[in-house]
């Protein structure tokens, strides 16, 4: 093989630059690299007693150098494909026009904020630890997901501002929208139990009452609600925080945003599959390397921006300045080129929360109504135990949490 191929999209261009510090070129050429391949020390069991992590053992797949070379090569190939267009053509509405940082350009190299990369489906073993109380570990259970796209970045303040303008103009999600019609014969995510199959039903209009602005009554409703939760990344007017991930958004608003933007909330199985690297079942989205405290792999432990925070912190950050612009941890690149799958803000998912897995699971979701919904990925305040793709938290869907954000998924 010749010299390292150049990356063909901004996300992977930046990833290739960052990973060059740990010999990404050698990985592409098939030469094993200890950082990409993992080693016995780094592949030790994840400490589940860390802050916001549960107890129990964690078995992780050993990433070989060859697998990692394929991963980076695949990321380049996937990133070279066009980002999805919404129905009728054009980019997703949150990134339409020339909105500048946080709207049309994200990350240090100015990627399209709406880049959405293909996650190639497959089967993996689900074994989660859960929070916020910790201590619960579910037994292993297989799950299969079909191909889907997962956005490269968490939703930014700038992108959400476009959504606020749309709701101010009267937009609300249509009844039944947000269903993953690409799976299960067009019926969407399913749950099989006691001889019956239940399918997702999409947006319920009664949920609009749980949004900040249910009737398009004015942008001021959003300002009041989003700023009640502190520290909030939202500002009433555009400013220096447009590239920060939006936090303090509740589940209903997260779901509505993704519908408006031409996508949907990923299921718990889909999100976990992407974060674990599919069948590789990585310890962290990037592999087995310890994330350290220099904000290169993940924004966590109140370490941002100077790396001088408190490892395994339990929520001592008190300012939006402790939350990083999306894409600020370049070595945290997931198998399919997503960034910030661990840390910064946790990501709200479609499923209701349950201690038991949906089984069997083929494009499944927990559809039995409950008082909480699943969130995954850890946040800027968590300890290292919550950076695993297996970690899950749960929150009431109307709750605003300063650690919580959203990332959308899309049809392949």
Which functions belong to the PLM regions below?
Residues 401-412:
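Short, structured beta-strand segments at or near domain termini in extracellular proteins/domains
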Residues 1-23:
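Sec-dependent bacterial lipoprotein signal peptides
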Residues 118-119, 125, 200, 204, ...:
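Functional-site microenvironments in short loops/helix caps that host divalent-cation chemistry
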Residues 23-105, 133:
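Ser/Thr-rich, Pro/Gly/Ala-heavy low-complexity intrinsically disordered linkers and tails
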Residues 107-225, 229-230, 248-250, 343:
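A short glycine-rich, aromatic-capped structural motif
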Residues 149-151, 159-161, 255, 260, ...:
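Residues within well-ordered beta-strands of beta-sheet-rich folds
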Residues 23, 93, 104, 111-112, ...:
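Extracellular secreted precursors and ectodomains with disulfide-bonded cysteine-rich loops/domains
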């Amino acid at each position: 093989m010749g010299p390292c191929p150049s990356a063909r999209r901004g996300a992977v261009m930046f990833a290739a630059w960052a990973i060059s510090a740990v010999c990404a070129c050698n990985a592409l050429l098939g030469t094993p690299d200890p950082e990409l391949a993992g080693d016995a020390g780094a592949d030790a069991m994840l400490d589940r007693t860390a802050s916001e992590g549960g107890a129990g053992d964690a078995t992780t797949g050993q990433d070989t150098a060859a697998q990692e070379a394929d991963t980076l090569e695949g990321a380049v190939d996937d990133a070279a494909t066009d980002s999805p267009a919404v129905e009728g053509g054009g980019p997703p509405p949150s990134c339409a026009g020339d909105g500048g940082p946080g709207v049309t350009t994200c990350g240090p190299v100015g990627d399209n904020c709406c880049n959405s990369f293909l996650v190639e489906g497959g089967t993996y073993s689900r074994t989660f630890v859960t929070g916020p109380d910790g201590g619960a570990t579910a037994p292993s259970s297989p799950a299969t997901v079909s191909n889907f796209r997962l956005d490269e970045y968490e939703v930014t303040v700038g992108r959400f501002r476009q959504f606020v303008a749309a709701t101010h103009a009267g937009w609300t999600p249509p009844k039944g929208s947000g269903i993953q019609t690409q799976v299960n014969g067009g019926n969407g995510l399913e749950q099989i139990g006691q001889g019956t199959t239940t399918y997702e039903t999409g947006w319920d209009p009664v949920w609009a009452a749980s949004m900040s602005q249910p009737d398009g009554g004015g942008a001021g409703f959003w300002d009041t609600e989003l700023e009640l939760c502190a520290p909030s990344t939202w500002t009433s007017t555009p400013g220096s925080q447009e590239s920060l991930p939006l936090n303090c958004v509740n589940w209903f608003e997260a779901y509505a945003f993704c519908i408006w933007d031409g996508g949907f909330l990923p299921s718990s199985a889909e999100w976990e599959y992407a974060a674990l690297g599919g069948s590789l079942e990585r310890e962290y989205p990037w592999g087995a390397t310890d994330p350290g405290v220099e904000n290169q792999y993940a924004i966590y432990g109140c370490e941002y921006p100077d790396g001088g925070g408190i490892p395994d912190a339990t929520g001592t950050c008190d300012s939006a300045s402790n939350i990083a612009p999306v894409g600020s941890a370049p070595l945290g690149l997931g198998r399919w080129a997503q960034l910030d799958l661990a840390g910064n803000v946790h990501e709200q998912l479609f499923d209701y929360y349950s201690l038991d897995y949906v089984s069997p699971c083929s494009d499944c979701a927990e559809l039995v109504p409950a008082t909480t919904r699943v969130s995954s990925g850890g946040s800027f305040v968590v300890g290292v135990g919550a950076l695993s793709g297996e970690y899950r938290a749960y929150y009431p869907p109307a709750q605003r949490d300063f650690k919580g954000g959203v990332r959308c998924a899309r049809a392949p």
